[in-house]
Every structure is written in C-alpha cells, then in structure tokens.
Amino acid sequence: MTKVILSGCSGKMGKMISQSVNNFEGLSIVAGIDKFKDESLKYPIFENITECDVNADVVLDFSRPDALDSLLSYSKDNNLPVVLCTTGYSKEQLDKIDEYSKIVPVFHSANMSIGINLINNILKDISAMLYENYDIEIIEKHHNQKVDAPSGTALLLGNTIKDSIKEDTVFNKGRNGIKKREKNEIGIHAIRGGSIVGEHEVIFAGAGEIIELKHTALSREVFAMGALKACEYMAGKNNGLYTMDDVIKSKN
C-alpha cells in the first residue's frame, strides 16, 4: 500500500482527491496538510508539513505556490517523492524545482489531465509545420476563484508551441489597444467566470480554414485521478524530474 500525505487537503481539489482515492486499491491518504481542518476527512490534518510525523511514501500537493519551500525541504529531509500539482509558480520557484529534482524524486505538471497532456504531445508534432501559414491563439476558461492568469496549462501549451518553432516567438497575453497582430505572436487569453472547471483551446487560424484543438474538463475528478496515478507512478522512483508524459508512457 502506497501511503500519501495530501497537502491542500481541505480545498476543492483536496476533497476530490480524498473521494477519488477509493478507486485505487494500492493507495491510501494517511495525513493531510491544511490550515483549515475539515472534520469530515478521515485522517489527521496538520497546519504545516513540518509538524507531520506520519510515515508515508509520497507527498502530493494541491495547495498554493508559497508552500513549495516547505514541501521540498520535507521531501528532502524524509527522502520522499513529491508530486507537485499546484500552478502559478514563479520562474525562481520553477528553477528551485529543477534544482531539488537532482536530490529527490520530483513530479511536476501544470495539468493532471491525460487529455491535456495528449494535446500537448500533438502540439509538439504539428506546431512547426503549421506556424508559417497559421496564426496561433490560445483561449483558457476557468471559474471565478482561480487566482493565476494565464493558467499554468495555457502556458504549458504555449511554451510547447514556442519550443517547437525555430523562429523567435512572443506571447501576447490579453490583446488590447489599437495594434496590428504580429506574425511571431502567440496570443493567450484568460476568461474567468462562474464555476467553469477548465477549458483550453488552441486555434490555428489560416486563410480559409481554422484548426482547433480543444479540451474541456467536466469535473475536477479528472485532475484528481491523474494526480493519484502520478502518486502510484512516483512511489519508489529515483531522483529526477518527472512529468505526466512519464505516467502516460508507463501505461503503454
């Protein structure tokens, strides 16, 4: 049985993970980390991970970027793999994740959905081929409580496109004003409203036709299931930086 410490256990995603873990025979949540103690959860909850004295095999985080330092330190001190599902990290924090992956097993993905990661792989294959004759725009939609924009997933998709194209490209985040669209732009637009779980659309707009890749999450369960699959995968892994691609490939 792989024992999981869940950081952010009292949030919406934390609660969904606590429900979804019942679908995994080989996983159990043995402790939670959150400043809000939800009495409905059936495991001990600590306000800070430094207080946690429960034996575990993996740390799973769905909290906030400012928890990163304590999570990485705990993972290092206890020699535990850490699964980072939080978005909104700064460049400095992303660099720290890379640095720590040399001494502990670290999983990091901007989106835990299998579908999004398959679209990301498709973009690696088609972006360079389409760039010359198509304008590229990304639209992402989320609920009105999401604090980071553009979403980590939109940036993931955008960076995949940028990395696939030999020419220098730039992000135009939220086009505004009176200005002609430049050829080397990749537009990224964020919409916030209601209870939208998550929707991402990549548009290749050419002369006379439009190619669209779109993913819609209908429930947070899709992210919870992906995160728990990542926990299964990371148990016992060697030091290194892992992504959802590694999880997908392991199932083939």
From Swiss-Prot:
Gene3D superfamilies linked: Dihydrodipicolinate Reductase, domain 2, NAD(P)-binding Rossmann-like Domain
* Main subcellular location of this protein, as a coarse class: cytoplasm
Q: Where in the cell is it found?
A: Cytoplasm
Q: Which GO terms describe its molecular function?
A: 4-hydroxy-tetrahydrodipicolinate reductase; NAD binding; NADP binding; oxidoreductase activity, acting on CH or CH2 groups, NAD or NADP as acceptor
* Domain of life, per lineage: Bacteria
Query: Catalyses which reaction?
Result: (S)-2,3,4,5-tetrahydrodipicolinate + NAD(+) + H2O = (2S,4S)-4-hydroxy-2,3,4,5-tetrahydrodipicolinate + NADH + H(+); (S)-2,3,4,5-tetrahydrodipicolinate + NADP(+) + H2O = (2S,4S)-4-hydroxy-2,3,4,5-tetrahydrodipicolinate + NADPH + H(+)
The catalytic site is made up of: 142, 146
Tell me a GO biological process for this protein: diaminopimelate biosynthetic process
Q: What is its EC number?
A: 1.17.1.8
Q: What pathway is this protein said to act in by its record?
A: Amino-acid biosynthesis; L-lysine biosynthesis via DAP pathway; (S)-tetrahydrodipicolinate from L-aspartate: step 4/4
Q: Which residues bind NAD(+)?
A: 8-13, 85-87, 109-112
Enzyme class label:
oxidoreductase
For this UniProt record, the keywords arranged alphabetically read as follows:
Amino-acid biosynthesis, Cytoplasm, Diaminopimelate biosynthesis, Lysine biosynthesis, NAD, NADP, Oxidoreductase
Residue sites binding (S)-2,3,4,5-tetrahydrodipicolinate per the record: 143, 152-153
Question: Which InterPro entries does this one have?
Answer: DapB_C, DapB_N, DapB_N_CS, DHDPR_bac, NAD(P)-bd_dom_sf
Instruction: Offer one Pfam family short name for this entry.
Output: DapB_C
What SUPFAM superfamilies does the annotation carry?
Answer: Glyceraldehyde-3-phosphate dehydrogenase-like, C-terminal domain, NAD(P)-binding Rossmann-fold domains
Cellular component, GO, one term:
cytosol
UniProt lists the family membership as follows:
Belongs to the DapB family.
* NCBIfam families on file: dapB
What does this chain do?
Catalyzes the conversion of 4-hydroxy-tetrahydrodipicolinate (HTPA) to tetrahydrodipicolinate.
According to UniProt, the name of this protein is: 4-hydroxy-tetrahydrodipicolinate reductase
Q: In which organism is this protein found? A: Clostridium novyi (strain NT)
Lineage summary:
Bacteria, Bacillati, Bacillota, Clostridia, Eubacteriales
Designated gene of the protein: dapB
